């Protein structure tokens, strides 16, 4: 399916490789992705539920074994100093995913930026277009404010910018997709943009193809 979408990079979730599995299974999963021509760029979302060296270390070993340069995470504030220590040890980035108004810890990009202020530059933000807009935040302004702390980007489209249940094919909704890509280019953004297509789970391919086609068209149309 991903090959039909002509993508070369992927963010891996536990559905693809489980953290609790033997590390040999992680290596096996990585080889399977690589054999399919896919490079694993990140893993997660990981919650870092236990504030212990053993648990945090295993999550970083998992990311490293899969060849991921970063971890998408949704931790509690108290765990961040420990995570930062392992970021330095493994040279693996860790970016907090803001989840909108339902998230009691990190609802907005600004809440993430405040949490990682003063920390290692590899501690940052995974900005989600849909959740950010639903939180009542100016998406483009938030991107610019985050600057180099924005290490990862999840893109989705919504027909109703206040309703998470109106997710749709990218380009069919109200999220300013073209402006997003223009802003990323103007910022000289070097991270990944991951499509989150959460529609028609039984037959997602047509919508994925349409989403990638729209995004590639938006990129091609950028002149500055």
Where are the model-predicted features located?
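Catalytic domains of carbohydrate-active enzymes, especially glycoside hydrolases
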Residues: 1-15, 66-67
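Active-site acidic/histidine proton-transfer and metal-coordination neighborhood
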Residues: 9, 32-127, 133-136, 145, ...
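Glycine-rich, proline-tolerant flexible connector loops at the mouths of alpha/beta enzymes
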Residues: 9-30
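Conserved residues at the C-terminal ends of beta-strands
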Residues: 13, 44-46, 74, 156, ...
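Short, acidic/turn-prone active-site loops that include or flank metal/cofactor-
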Residues: 15-16, 100-101, 155-157
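Stable alpha-helical elements in mature extracytoplasmic
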Residues: 29, 59, 79, 83, ...
């Amino acid at each position: 399916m991903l090959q039909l979408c002509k993508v070369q990079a992927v963010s891996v979730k536990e559905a693809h490789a489980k953290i609790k599995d033997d590390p040999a299974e992680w290596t096996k999963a990585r080889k399977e992705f690589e054999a399919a021509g896919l490079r694993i760029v990140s893993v997660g979302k990981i919650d870092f539920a236990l504030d212990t060296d053993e648990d945090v270390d295993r999550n970083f070993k998992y990311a490293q074994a899969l060849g991921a340069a970063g971890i998408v995470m949704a931790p509690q504030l108290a765990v961040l100093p420990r995570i930062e220590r392992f970021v330095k040890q493994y040279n693996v980035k860790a970016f907090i995913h803001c989840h909108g108004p339902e998230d009691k810890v990190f609802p907005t990009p600004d809440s993430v930026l405040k949490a990682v202020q003063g920390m290692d530059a590899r501690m940052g933000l995974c900005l989600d277009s849909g959740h950010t807009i639903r939180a009542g935040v100016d998406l483009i302004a938030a991107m610019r404010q985050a600057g180099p702390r924005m290490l990862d980007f999840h893109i989705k489209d919504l027909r109703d910018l206040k309703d998470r249940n109106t997710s749709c094919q990218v380009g069919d909704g109200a999220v300013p997709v073209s402006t997003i890509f223009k802003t990323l280019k103007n910022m000289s953004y070097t991270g990944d943009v991951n499509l989150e297509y959460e529609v028609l789970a039984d037959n997602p391919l047509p919508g994925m193809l349409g989403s990638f086609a729209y995004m590639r068209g938006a990129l091609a149309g950028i002149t500055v």
